[in-house]
């Protein structure tokens, strides 16, 4: 089956990378997992082999329905739709972990959406991302790569690059390098669902060279914070 460019399909096929991801995720029979874009089910089968409690898969490409429905496992729950627009609040049982090779063009909006469910019990994500996106998410304070999503993740937990992944590990091979990124959500669970918090972060980065006081006029800021720039923020 030909991969569709409009869906950003680059299927992970390297067994060594799959093994690295499974070892890193440390899955157990208590975990309910969400996979975004299961494709041909290669990662799906690896997750099910870890004896997880259940696995939700959200897939947009209806051409993959026969192949995915052919995976006979009562723990597998298939959902069809756009991952960015999907109503994740309807998932039962609700996942505590996300493991996915996600289409790179939806990386930022998808992670923002998933973070909203920290107060429902989502605590962990292991994601295959474009290397550039991985570097931005894990960028340190006071660096040019720093952006709102990275600051938000810092406020609720941590993110780190686990492994860099070359193009030949995918079919078709993307034109960019990739990386496996681990995100742990350990605190401030309600914060990720706050529209005000998201708005403040984005406004803070609207003009990177300006201080927070200038970008957030009309908002009362703690002493000393107004002179900082958004990229200087840390947890």
What is each stretch, according to the model?
Residues 185, 201-235:
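C-terminal lobe and adjacent flexible extensions of AdoMet/dcAdoMet transferase-like proteins
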Residues 1-203:
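Catalytic cores of RNA-modifying enzymes
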